[in-house]
């Protein structure tokens, strides 16, 4: 063992959790001295980063912790994606996370890259107790307005969620005609892990729908802007007119 190289030392701690890796490295330092210092420094930085992320995550668990202390067991976070775009549906998600789960990187979907959201989408679906999705299309948005369509999508998401939750954490809204206690949290996607998880599920689900629509209507660039009112999108509407997934009530000002 006394002739181990730096690479061999590093390989010997691969796969261990950070505390066990550091414990082993501190022991190896007595034998290998300076050869271990850079590896120790690397793992200490990893641990600091992990602890910082864990503390951030725990700050987003405050609402959940209070609800658990009050006796609630199944907390569903609810959020939507797609209230503002000129095209496509509004999508809502309802997510119940296990009480002690730690999903590293979980955050408000708007603060994440597309690649981060896609990875977290799979992790959330794997670890969640339940996930429900509700989709309201552009025609219904035109008929009942975007606020009512958003609430309808959220109700559909709750209806598709199993098991039935004890309480709903909703980002900024209250829902009518639902016989479950609700807690409306302003900017909840940045304050509650349950709502943040729902925001990611809703956003990724909607983005995938718009990428599919891009194949059908490639001239609008839906895969890039996801239906939002970018300069590219508005110019395409002026040039080609609207397509079947455009919201008439949102695009009438751009139609010549």
Curated annotation (Swiss-Prot):
Alphabetical list of InterPro entries matching this protein: RNase_HII, RNase_HII/HIII, RNase_HII/HIII_dom, RNaseH-like_sf, RNaseH_sf
Main location class: cytoplasm
Root EC class: hydrolase
UniProt cofactor note: Manganese or magnesium. Binds 1 divalent metal ion per monomer in the absence of substrate. May bind a second metal ion after substrate binding.
Cell compartments where the protein resides: Cytoplasm
GO CC, alphabetical: cytoplasm; ribonuclease H2 complex
PROSITE patterns: RNASE_H_2
Pfam families: RNase_HII
Residue ranges of every copy of the RNase H type-2 domain listed in the record: 73-256
Keywords attached to this entry: Cytoplasm, Endonuclease, Hydrolase, Manganese, Metal-binding, Nuclease
A molecular function (GO) term: RNA-DNA hybrid ribonuclease activity
NCBIfam families: PRK00015.1-1 (NF000594), PRK00015.1-3 (NF000595)
Record function comment: Endonuclease that specifically degrades the RNA of RNA-DNA hybrids.
The protein, known as: Ribonuclease HII
Gene: rnhB
């Amino acid at each position: 063992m006394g002739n181990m190289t730096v690479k061999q030392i590093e390989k010997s701690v691969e796969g261990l959790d950070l505390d066990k890796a550091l414990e082993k490295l501190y022991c190896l330092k007595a034998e290998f001295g300076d050869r271990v210092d850079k590896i120790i420094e690397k793992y200490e930085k990893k641990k600091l980063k992990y602890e910082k992320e864990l503390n951030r995550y725990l700050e987003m668990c405050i609402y959940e912790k209070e609800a658990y202390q009050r006796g609630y067991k199944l907390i569903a976070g609810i959020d939507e994606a797609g209230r503002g775009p000129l095209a496509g549906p509004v999508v809502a998600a309802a997510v119940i996370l296990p009480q002690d789960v730690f999903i590293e990187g979980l955050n408000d979907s708007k603060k994440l890259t597309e690649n981060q959201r896609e990875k977290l989408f799979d992790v959330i679906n794997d670890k969640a107790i339940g996930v429900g999705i509700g989709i309201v299309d552009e025609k219904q948005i035109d008929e009942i307005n975007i606020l009512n369509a958003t609430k309808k999508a959220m109700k559909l998401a709750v209806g598709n969620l199993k098991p039935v939750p004890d309480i709903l954490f909703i980002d900024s809204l209250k829902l009518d005609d639902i016989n479950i206690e609700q807690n409306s949290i302003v900017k909840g996607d940045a304050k509650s892990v349950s709502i943040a998880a729902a925001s990611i599920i809703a956003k990724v689900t909607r983005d995938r729908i718009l990428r599919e629509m891009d194949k059908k209507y490639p001239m609008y660039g839906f895969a890039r802007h996801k239906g939002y009112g970018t300069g590219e999108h508005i110019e395409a509407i002026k040039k080609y007119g609207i397509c079947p997934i455009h919201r008439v009530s949102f695009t009438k000002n751009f139609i010549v």
